[in-house]
């Protein structure tokens, strides 16, 4: 690597397994062959950045047959990987679609693997080697069982020592322990920021983050050294998913990364990120067998939504 690669880290990567169901007969519901897709917010970030032509490397932890399928799916998408292999089985999410159009889908989530101290040590060594060629690191998502709550804090510190900027997407205890290590940008939901730090984006800045982007209620509020901005869609129903939801959070983070690296103005960063997130990119947006296999962005929707994003300083009371 030559110092221009964006490294994404997904420590709790998931394999999304989707089934289409048929009409039940004699208490038996037929299902389709499964569709597999690599998931986890860091994986989504890597996939979307790759779609926009950025050099990316998806790293993290992966194990078992599910881990192999995660790596294979990313390879089919053209996304390079450098996962540290573990003995446990990577978690799986299951989705069973309703046979009636517009009907509800059933979703199930496994708890995921337990990570040993030895496995964490191997990952840390791999991660520090990857930093030598990284333009930025994106740390995303929950931590699997076995990892200490300050794991992200250590990874932020390693990156800072290597001179590599860090974008952190986390919440709760993981965020609370990491923010004092001074990540360059924190992305969080409003409730995750409250749970992790007892406050807002401004609280994250006081605790050590250089900048913070907080998603809530279809809006994104950014607090930075250069000022504060709020981005929203007008009209509010210009697109479906709320950028807070799990499907769109990875897209929101991916939308903020290029501007962080290239020094865009914050209004431009937020416009790009919210338009991308509002498209609802995520592993559940396609059922098995659907035609769109571009593994990325609906560019027409993205360009249309750019014009629907309004960015303004927050109203002063």
Residue ranges and their predicted role:
Residues 2, 268-317:
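Charged C-terminal helix
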Residues 136-199:
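Conserved beta-alpha-beta core of the PfkB/ribokinase-like small-molecule kinase fold
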Residues 194-195, 240-270:
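Short, small-residue alpha-helix embedded
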Residues 51-135, 296-317:
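Conserved N-terminal subdomain of the carbohydrate kinase-like
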Residues 184-185, 200-239:
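Conserved phosphate-donor
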Residues 50, 205, 261:
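Gly/Ala-rich phosphate-binding loop of Rossmann-like dinucleotide-binding domains
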Residues 55-58, 226-229, 234, 259-274:
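Phosphate-handling active-site elements
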Residues 1-59, 238-242, 309-317:
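Glycine-rich phosphate/adenosyl-contacting loop at the front of the ribokinase-like
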């Amino acid at each position: 690597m030559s110092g221009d690669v964006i490294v994404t880290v997904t420590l709790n990567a998931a394999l999304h397994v989707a089934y289409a169901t048929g009409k039940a007969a004699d208490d038996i519901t037929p299902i389709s062959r499964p569709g597999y897709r690599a998931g986890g917010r860091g994986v989504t970030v890597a996939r979307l950045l790759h779609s926009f032509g950025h050099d990316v490397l998806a790293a993290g932890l992966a194990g078992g047959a599910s881990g192999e399928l995660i790596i294979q799916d990313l390879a089919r998408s053209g996304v390079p990987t450098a996962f540290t292999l573990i003995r446990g089985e990577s978690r799986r999410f299951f989705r069973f679609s309703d046979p009636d159009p517009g009907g509800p889908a059933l979703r199930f989530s496994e708890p995921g693997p337990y990570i040993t101290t030895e496995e964490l040590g191997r990952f840390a060594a791999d991660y520090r080697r990857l930093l030598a060629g990284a333009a930025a690191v994106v740390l995303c998502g929950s931590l699997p069982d076995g990892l200490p709550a300050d794991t992200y804090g250590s990874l932020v510190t390693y990156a800072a020592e290597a001179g590599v900027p860090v974008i952190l997407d986390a919440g709760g205890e993981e965020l609370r322990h990491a923010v004092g290590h001074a990540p360059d940008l924190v992305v969080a939901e409003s409730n995750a920021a409250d749970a992790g730090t007892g406050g807002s984006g401004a609280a994250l800045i006081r605790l050590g983050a250089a900048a913070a982007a907080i998603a809530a209620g279809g809006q994104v509020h950014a607090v930075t050294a250069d000022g504060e901005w709020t981005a929203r869609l007008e009209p509010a129903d210009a697109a479906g998913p709320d950028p807070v939801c799990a499907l769109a959070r990875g897209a929101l983070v991916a939308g903020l990364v290029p501007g962080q690296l290239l020094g865009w103005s914050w209004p431009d960063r937020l416009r790009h990120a919210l338009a991308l997130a509002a498209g609802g990119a995520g592993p559940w947006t396609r059922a098995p067998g659907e035609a769109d296999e571009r593994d990325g962005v609906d560019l027409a929707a993205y360009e249309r939504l750019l014009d629907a994003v309004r960015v303004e300083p927050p109203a002063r009371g």
